[in-house]
Design a protein with these regions (language model features):
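Short loop/turn segments at secondary-structure transitions that flank enzyme active sites
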Residues: 73-76, 93-96, 159-161, 194-197
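Acidic, metal-ligating active-site segments
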Residues: 75-116
Length: 368
């Protein structure tokens, strides 16, 4: 253990200081628990939390709605001589006749060589390549599901992805892909697993529900984890928050607001809610892409339908994510060890003739 390798004098000093820090943290957590319950009461009185409500007849109809899911992953390996290889996996999950435990699954693998100065640059390039692959997959799924009265495509991630990538051509292509789905009567839903930032906190400040900076709640995850836990205990059912327009949680300092403006200028509106399926479950952000203006009541009705589809139709008992999202994530996952083995195969073939391996060995020493 790393703990045992640390110098004993240093460990002794740190342990005593940790005991004092723990006492202070205990008091802070007590205050957070108290403040979160007070805030829950304030939010509850303003109808911020909603239960997922659908009768049997509605659920039977939802089960028959076609649905697909798309996800992608990547690994970048190499770097010798400035050449990297990006391994990309893209998965499509398609249920053309509605709910099923055996949907159609299509998986595409891509190997793309890229030249870059360092890992930071290659990561950004790789992420964009993966997203372009996902856009192509969304169109393929839309071609299978579109043309009917109503269908859905779930994206494992946000609608605007990458959130800070403001390339005009890329934004145009992504908006066109989402608009194509819209013309085919397909609702595109972003299922975001990592809640980041302080958009909901900003909204509460704007509505003066929370005043100014708050020492107890720093970001949305801290705030919602405690408050939505109380909401679930109170209602004994999954809950989600009042749907917000993307702009309602942005500030002038928020870089994502600048990216969203590029999408909105092209006609795209995004609404989102925070969703907690169980007391011990994680918090997710559910995003909805729109190319029309709806009233507040219409937005609420749309989200109740979306949440019913996700939670009551496609989320199995004991799980907190919809089945298509789970399948797509697992099927597209390019694991690090697999990417390194494939890269080894590429280099083995590349260096099979002549004295190229001598050059490689000399170059490798400079990376050690």
């Amino acid at each position: 253990m790393e703990f045992n390798k640390t110098e004993p004098e240093l460990l002794t000093d740190l342990v005593f200081k940790a005991m004092r820090a723990g006492e202070g943290e205990m008091e802070r957590l007590k205050q957070i628990s108290k403040k979160s319950y007070e805030l829950f009461g304030s939010l509850e009185s303003r109808d911020i939390f909603y239960q997922i409500i659908s009768d049997g007849e509605v659920l039977e109809k939802l089960k028959k709605i076609p649905l697909g899911a798309v996800d992608g992953s990547f690994q970048s390996v190499g770097g010798l001589g400035g050449r990297w290889y990006v391994m990309i996996g893209i998965a499509q999950v398609i249920a053309e006749r509605g709910f099923t435990l055996n949907p159609v699954i299509n998986v595409d693998g891509i190997i793309e060589p890229l030249n870059a100065v360092d890992e930071g640059v290659i990561y950004e390039l790789s992420e964009v390549l993966m997203m372009l692959g996902e856009m192509l997959a969304i169109r393929k799924v839309a071609n299978r599901l579109g043309g009917g009265e109503e269908s859905y495509i779930l994206i494992d991630g946000p609608i605007i992805d990458p959130p800070l990538y403001a390339n005009e051509k890329y934004v145009e292509d992504r908006v066109n892909t989402l608009r194509f789905c819209y013309t085919q009567n397909i609702h595109v839903i972003g299922f975001v697993k990592r809640v980041r930032g302080s958009h909901f906190l900003n909204y509460l400040r704007r509505k003066q529900i929370i005043e100014g900076k708050n020492e107890y709640f720093i970001n949305d995850l801290d705030l919602l984890s405690s408050v939505m836990f109380n909401a679930i205990k109170n209602r004994a059912s999954p809950v989600y928050t009042y749907p917000l327009n993307y702009e309602e949680g942005c500030t002038n300092e928020d870089k994502t607001a600048l990216t969203y403006k590029m999408y909105k200028d092209r006609g795209l509106n995004i609404y989102y809610t925070y969703y907690k399926p169980s007391a011990r479950g994680r918090i997710f952000r559910i995003e909805y892409a729109l190319f029309e203006n709806l009233s507040e009541q219409e937005i609420k009705e749309r989200f109740n339908r979306i949440m019913s589809l996700l939670n009551q139709v496609w989320t199995p008992l004991g799980m907190d994510q919809p089945l298509p999202i789970i399948i797509a994530h697992n099927k597209c996952n390019v694991r690090r060890g697999a990417a390194e083995t494939i890269y080894y195969e590429i280099m083995t073939r590349a260096l099979s003739e002549g004295n190229l391996h001598l050059w490689l060995e000399s170059l490798t020493e400079s990376y050690i």
